[in-house]
Amino acid sequence: MTGAMAQTKLNIVLCGFMGCGKSTVGKKLSQMTQMEFVDMDGYIEKRAGMKSPDIFEKHGEGFFRDLEHEAAVELSQRGGYVVATGGGALTFQRNVDAFKEGGVIVLLDTPLRVLQLRLKNDRNRPLLQRPDRFRFIRELHQKRMPLYRRAADVVIPTKGSPNAVCRQVLQALEEKNLTNS
């Protein structure tokens, strides 16, 4: 399976709410499949030459979302990546469409209470720097999860270790014949 994945041009696109483990699982999945890992926000930041919060502040959300879409199209055309999307990327249908053209979308489904515990002391996410962070997380989670579920080809509950989640992802892709192998 892992050798076959390395030869494929299909992307494995990980989506889910912030704190669900997209980057952690993505890096491990990259090692297991010998596919290159791409953190979408990092990819956008590198291309723009500035951090995401600075892009939002200087150019606005619309500009960031355009860069995000360009990245989705580019990655889908090139293929062969494990992609960790930003939390908002797949709330836009044009990004869902782009990623589905070149890959398989995998939702890492993590219970809200687990996300709240993981994000409780997170100081690296500008969206969470607010006094009502738990209410905000709950409301955003309720808004985004139906969009993630609609976009996903595969839904993986994030119970167990990151390695166990990776094995579940690979098994699900194989069972659904979504590996091009």
What are these regions (language model features)?
Residues 63-108:
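Glycine-rich phosphate-binding loop used to anchor ATP phosphates in small-molecule kinases
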Residues 14:
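Hydrophobic anchor at the beta1->P-loop junction of P-loop NTPases
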Residues 31-70:
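Conserved substrate/cofactor phosphate-moiety recognition/catalytic segment
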Residues 23:
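Walker A/P-loop
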Residues 101-146:
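A glycine- and Lys/Arg-enriched "phosphate-lid" helix/loop adjacent to the NTP-binding pocket
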Residues 20:
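ATP-binding Walker
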